[in-house]
Amino acid sequence: MKSATLLALSYLLIALYFLICEAEHSRYEEHEILEENMGDVVNLEQRSCAKPGEMCMRIKCCDGQCGCNRGTGRCFCK
């Protein structure tokens, strides 16, 4: 009984994490990048700047994919 309850709670926690993450992204993302970075055409070379679960421009990246412009240091979730 305890293991089933723990498993159910774990499942709910994971589902809640993804729902919150998707809700955050739907407000900011358009065409897979943040709106505030869409107009930036300088330094288009990107590098990874986030580990899974880290924040990127104050937004949690669901899968840890975060791109940065080298010159400006501005990041966006991919």
Swiss-Prot record:
Domain comment quoted from the record: The presence of a 'disulfide through disulfide knot' structurally defines this protein as a knottin.
Protein name: Hainantoxin-XX.2
Entry GO CC: extracellular region
Superkingdom of this protein's organism: Eukaryota
Tissue-specificity statement: Expressed by the venom gland.
Propeptide intervals in chain numbering: 24-47
Similarity field: Belongs to the hainantoxin family. 20 subfamily.
Cysteines engaged in disulfide bonds, as pairs: C49-C62, C56-C66, C61-C77
Subcellular location: Secreted
Keywords from the named record: Disulfide bond, Ion channel impairing toxin, Knottin, Potassium channel impairing toxin, Secreted, Signal, Toxin, Voltage-gated potassium channel impairing toxin
Functional summary from the UniProt entry: Moderately inhibits Kv1.1/KCNA1 and Kv1.2/KCNA2 and weakly inhibits Kv1.3/KCNA3, and Kv2.1/KCNB1 voltage-gated potassium channels.
Record GO terms (molecular function): potassium channel regulator activity; toxin activity
Signal peptide: 1-23
